[in-house]
Amino acid sequence: MVDMKQRILTGVLAAIVFLFLVIVGKLPFTILIYAMGSVALFELLRMKKLKLVSLPGLIGLLLLWMFLLPSQYSFFEADGISKMEIALFAVLLLLTYTVLVKNTFTFDEVGFITLAAIYIGMCFHYFIEIRNLDQYGLTYIFYACVVIWSTDSGAYFVGKSLGKRKLWPEISPNKTVEGFAGGIVIALVLATIFQLVAQLPIPYIYLLLITLFLSVFGQLGDLVESALKRHYDVKDSGNILPGHGGILDRFDSFLFVMPFLYFLLALFS
């Protein structure tokens, strides 16, 4: 009972802070995303048992911050230097470090830090990019929340009541095929209702297609997080949110959904 109360209290407080800063947008929201991305990166490094306070950890953090940088602040790109060149320079530094420490920091760990910074940095970057879109940026964020949360809830309740066939037992034993499909159906229904209220500038058929893709990719993001935790033998990615785990535990679906939402909006606009 105490754990449930803690879980509810944490969820309510976190949702209030998150939604408030989403509504405010601009610099406060960007700072929130930077903070969340930094914590998420440290959660991944901790899974790998890499030192957080170290030169590789610092390089990984700086690389993450560079990927998170909103488009309007990419001042260095005006000088012909792209994020790709900076990422390459960071990789070269990490590879040099493996030599200096005589392989106590390995090539595999260079790859892990680089991939972690790209995965967390680029995916959270699109949170900022979508919020900074025209007058519908805020509405698109709420739309993504509706799709993800309705998919999660639909998958859980349909899976509990009708689930028989395991979706991927080696990765997430509790997920079922019926729950996976149920999450998509519930997301489509609630996205349709959301469109009736919000009136996004997207034809209904396109909205349904986007919702379908996002619901699927959101569940894939959840499975990827489950696979990571199972591989590194951890229950939760972190404990910054009591009763809910870490940032990765709560935003695994968003990390897959936000880039695809941005690309699909560009495709269908």
From Swiss-Prot:
It comes from Bacillus subtilis (strain 168). The gene is cdsA. Signal peptide: none annotated. One of its GO terms (biological process) is CDP-diacylglycerol biosynthetic process. The chain crosses the membrane at residues 13-33, 50-70, 81-101, 110-130, 138-158, 180-200, 201-221, 247-267. Pathway: Phospholipid metabolism; CDP-diacylglycerol biosynthesis; CDP-diacylglycerol from sn-glycerol 3-phosphate: step 3/3. This is Phosphatidate cytidylyltransferase. It is an enzyme of class 2 (transferase). Its EC number is 2.7.7.41.
